[in-house]
Amino acid sequence: MASCVCVVRSEQWPLMTFDTTMSDKVKKINEHIRSQTKVSVQDQILLLDSKILKPHRALSSYGIDKENTIHLTLKVVKPSDEELPLSLVESGDEGQRHLLRVRRSSSVAQVKEMIENVTAVPPKKQIVNCNGKRLEDGKIMADYNIKSGSLLFLTAHCIGG
């Protein structure tokens, strides 16, 4: 399949260029953009003229196979900051669950305080994981890609090993 150059422009970043083929999926370009900008794939919208490109489709499906250079525009979608219901799962025999209402902008420290309110485990003794990552102080919940219904897993520090 013929190769071409994909040029992506946006308001926030300098021009980005990638080598691509017409059989490549749009998602591959999304991943290149994510690697350079740290903008998650779901927060990106790629435009060809005014047409929104779908991640699962091949570039050739947009009728641009005769070009050597594809010019795309990147728009970044800011996720809303409404409260999201999350389930906190405690470690232990029962695996008790608690409902927490958390914003994407909530700090990890704020979430740990919420957890203390429902479990009585102080923040310093909490180990909380979300989407396979340990929550770190100084970060916000958006850093962990939370969605409605995401699970938080709580384990407490074990003394003596």
Curated annotation (Swiss-Prot):
Q: What Gene3D superfamilies does the record tag this protein with?
A: Phosphatidylinositol 3-kinase Catalytic Subunit, Chain A, domain 1
PTM comment: the record says: Can be acetylated.
Q: Which residues form the Ubiquitin-like domain?
A: 3-77, 86-159
Coiled coil location: none
> Could you tell me which SMART domains the record lists for this protein?
UBQ
Residues with site note (Activation by thioester intermediate formation with UBA6): G160, G161
Induction remark: Possible cell-cycle regulation with highest expression during the S-phase (at protein level). Probably rapidly degraded by the proteasome.
User: Per its UniProt record, what PROSITE patterns does this chain match?
Assistant: UBIQUITIN_2
Example of a GO biological process term: response to tumor necrosis factor
Instruction: Give the chief site where it resides.
Output: nucleus
Q: Where in the cell is it found?
A: Nucleus; Cytoplasm
Annotated Gene Ontology cellular components are:
aggresome; cytoplasm; nucleus
List the GO molecular function terms: proteasome binding
Keywords for this entry? Acetylation, Cytoplasm, Nucleus, Repeat, Ubl conjugation pathway
Pfam families, from UniProt?
ubiquitin
Quaternary organization: Interacts directly with the 26S proteasome. Interacts with NUB1; this interaction facilitates the linking of UBD-conjugated target protein to the proteasome complex and accelerates its own degradation and that of its conjugates. Interacts (via ubiquitin-like 1 domain) with the spindle checkpoint protein MAD2L1 during mitosis. Present in aggresomes of proteasome inhibited cells. Interacts with HDAC6 under proteasome impairment conditions. Forms a thioester with UBA6 in cells stimulated with tumor necrosis factor-alpha (TNFa) and interferon-gamma (IFNg). Interacts with SQSTM1 and TP53/p53.
What is its biological role? Ubiquitin-like protein modifier which can be covalently attached to target proteins and subsequently leads to their degradation by the 26S proteasome, in a NUB1-dependent manner. Conjugation to the target protein is activated by UBA6 via adenylation of its C-terminal glycine. Probably functions as a survival factor. Promotes the expression of the proteasome subunit beta type-9 (PSMB9/LMP2). Regulates TNF-alpha-induced and LPS-mediated activation of the central mediator of innate immunity NF-kappa-B by promoting TNF-alpha-mediated proteasomal degradation of ubiquitinated-I-kappa-B-alpha.
UniProt record similarity statement: Belongs to the ubiquitin D family.
Q: What is this protein called in UniProt?
A: Ubiquitin D
Taxon lineage: Eukaryota, Metazoa, Chordata, Craniata, Vertebrata
Q: Gene name, please?
A: Ubd
